[in-house]
Design a protein with these regions (language model features):
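Final/C-terminal transmembrane alpha-helix of multipass membrane proteins
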Residues: 100-121
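Membrane-water interface of transmembrane alpha-helices
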Residues: 67-83
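Conserved small/polar residues in nucleotide/adenosyl-binding loops
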Residues: 122-127
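Short membrane-interface loop/juxtamembrane segments of multi-pass integral membrane proteins
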Residues: 14, 18, 82-101
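Membrane-associated alpha-helix detector
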Residues: 2-65
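Helical transmembrane-bundle signal
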Residues: 36, 61-68, 112-119
């Protein structure tokens, strides 16, 4: 099978892009978690927090994390699918090609979605 993306420069470019998008994914999830933890700290430390504003921040964080993370994952999947036979036969190549991307996306939706829904619901319904 001939692959037009098999030169050494293409391999270096793929590795660089994968590193960059992996770092972007890491920082997106980290910022989302930090934002949610800070929001929880604000809610617990201030008695009269504006419920609607807090919910808006949580929803904006959810949207940012999901859109950015899904884009990073799609890029990583595309980078993996561009590997030539030699790269894809390595352990790392096989791991990238067999990664359960939909499972990762589902976990993000469940975890950040659950945080957003539960904190917003609790904060909006408390007296």
């Amino acid at each position: 099978m001939t692959n037009k993306f098999a030169s050494a420069a293409d391999r270096d470019r793929r590795a660089s892009n994968a590193y960059t998008r992996g770092r972007d994914l890491y920082w997106t999830i980290s910022l989302g978690m930090i934002s949610n933890l800070v929001t929880l700290a604000i809610i617990s430390s201030i008695d009269d927090t504006p419920a609607l504003a807090i919910s808006a921040v949580l929803i904006a964080t959810l949207v940012f994390v999901l859109v950015s993370s899904f884009d990073c994952m799609d890029d990583l999947k595309a980078i993996a699918s561009d590997m030539d036979d030699e790269e894809s036969s390595t352990k790392l190549g096989a791991k990238l090609l067999g990664a359960p991307w939909y499972l990762f996306k589902g976990l993000l939706v469940i975890s950040f979605g659950a945080m957003t829904v539960t904190v917003s619901y609790t904060h909006l319904t408390l007296p």
